[in-house]
């Protein structure tokens, strides 16, 4: 029986490499998958899932107006799994489409994304995935400043932490640092530096 999975983690926790690994494992067995990503994510190129280690795959870009259920229902032959990157950017309607794909088409759906934003609020997509998913799994990484588990994202502008502003600001190493709760509230000022670019 198919299930809806939500695998969440902070920035730089390996979500994109995990989605590419899952796709590879299915396809190695001759089982086609569908890769989806947010139309908002243009860090590399719209319509691609890219990992920090250099792997990338083409994916269908979805937006607020995309009927994901109809898109998947029209694919023949049916995919064995639907994989979604940047799932935090999904809308409530998008997430309900994913639940319908699982329940009505009996296709497993795995959504990967951030849980909370830089203000420590849930993203809309993450909120509804937490409510509707059959399985919720955390992809872990460590704090930029210590060895604790990173659970939050710190937005940086000109070397300073930012706690106010628009929720969605597409960025990577230059804009966001994964931190533990302690260092989200009190980042060590003398050690605030953006992550190195590869």
UniProtKB/Swiss-Prot annotation:
Listed InterPro entries? P-loop_NTPase, Thymidine_kinase, Thymidine_kinase_CS
Catalysed conversion reaction: thymidine + ATP = dTMP + ADP + H(+)
The entry sums up its family as follows: Belongs to the thymidine kinase family.
Q: Give a GO molecular function annotation for the protein.
A: ATP binding
Organism of origin is Streptococcus thermophilus (strain ATCC BAA-250 / LMG 18311)
Protein name listed in UniProt = Thymidine kinase
Q: Which UniProt keywords apply?
A: ATP-binding, Cytoplasm, DNA synthesis, Kinase, Metal-binding, Nucleotide-binding, Transferase, Zinc
List, alphabetically, the NCBIfam families matched.
PRK04296.1-4, PRK04296.1-5
Please list every transmembrane segment annotated in the UniProt record, as residue ranges.
Answer: none
Summary of subunit composition and partner proteins = Homotetramer.
Which compartments does it reside in? Cytoplasm
- For the ligand (Zn(2+)), the binding residues are 143, 146, 180, 183
**Gene3D superfamilies reported for this sequence:** 3.30.60.20, P-loop containing nucleotide triphosphate hydrolases
The answer on whether this UniProt entry bears the keyword Transmembrane reads no
Q: Quote the catalytic residue positions.
A: 86
Q: What is its EC number?
A: 2.7.1.21
> What residues bind ATP, as annotated?
9-16, 85-88
Q: Which is a Gene Ontology cellular component entry for this protein?
A: cytosol
Lineage runs: Bacteria, Bacillati, Bacillota, Bacilli, Lactobacillales
Name the SUPFAM superfamilies on file.
Glucocorticoid receptor-like (DNA-binding domain), P-loop containing nucleoside triphosphate hydrolases
Identify one Pfam family in the record: TK
Q: Which domain of life is it from?
A: Bacteria
């Amino acid at each position: 029986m198919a299930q809806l999975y939500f695998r969440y983690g902070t920035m730089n926790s390996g979500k994109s490499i995990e989605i590419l690994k899952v796709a590879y494992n299915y396809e190695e067995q001759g089982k086609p998958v569908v890769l989806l990503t947010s139309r908002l994510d243009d860090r590399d190129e719209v319509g691609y899932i890219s990992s920090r280690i250099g792997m990338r795959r083409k994916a269908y870009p979805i937006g607020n107006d995309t009927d994901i259920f109809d898109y998947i229902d029209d694919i023949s032959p049916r995919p064995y799994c639907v994989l979604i990157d940047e799932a935090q950017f999904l809308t409530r309607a998008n997430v309900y489409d994913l639940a319908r794909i699982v329940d009505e088409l009996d296709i497993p759906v795995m959504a990967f994304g951030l849980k909370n934003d830089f203000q420590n609020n849930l993203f809309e997509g993450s909120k509804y995935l937490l409510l509707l998913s059959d399985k919720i799994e955390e992809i872990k990484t460590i704090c930029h400043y210590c060895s604790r588990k990173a659970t939050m994202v710190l937005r940086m502008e000109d070397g300073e932490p930012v706690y106010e502003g628009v929720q969605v600001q597409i960025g990577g190493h230059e804009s966001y640092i994964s931190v533990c709760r302690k260092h989200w509230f009190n980042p060590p000022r003398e050690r605030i530096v953006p992550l190195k670019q590869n």
